Amino acid sequence: TGLAYEVVPVYHEDAAGVNTEKMYRNITERWRWGGLDKVTKKGQVYLDETVRRMLSSNRGAIFDLARCLGVEAYNAKINPASVIYGNLPDSVEVVAQLTDAEQAKVDKYVSDRVKKIQTLLKLQQDKLPEVAMDYTFIEYDQLCKIYDLLYEITGDKQYQEKCLSLLETELNRFGKFMQYYESLPAPLYNSLSSQDLMIVSYYPYLIRQYYKYSGMDQKKTENLLRSLEKKYKFS
């Protein structure tokens, strides 16, 4: 549905988790924003724990919708007949070539989804900016997956570069933490908080994601690692 969960006694494996049309309309036309778009520098406003949770939930809702729109577009690209005939049972195989008019309908469908994703990402960036509150681990991961999906759909390198840029930002953000952790003697390292230990495990994950989203470009990934090691003096 739009933003709420519906409890219904029916399950269907083809049913999407998000009603993309309704939710897109709700977010772009019906949401009332709280003024965070006026924030121009970090620390300008104080956000308490409750507000931060709400902000994160709203970002997550936008990213969930963007991802679902991306999945719809991707599925239309790999199975264009689904746009024309709907989701057919696996036992039914469509072998007919699409007409020019049908292909145009598929292209329009994919383009519509891509434009909606772009609108959502711009809206999130404007109304819930990172300068007001840093992205969480999960939000960075969601954003990277969305940009990678856009790259898969369109083949446009700008989306891949944006994805890799986000990962580089995160790696630099936590590079100084890794430098500090490696400097600790064993007793102090063993006393690190769960949050610190999460960063320790998160860092290698970011590197793996960079390698994956770069198209498994080993040279590009190795160059990044050398740059990080030189900058933050960790191994």
Where do the PLM segments sit?
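ER/secretory pathway lumenal C-terminal domains and tails of membrane proteins involved
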Residues: 1-235
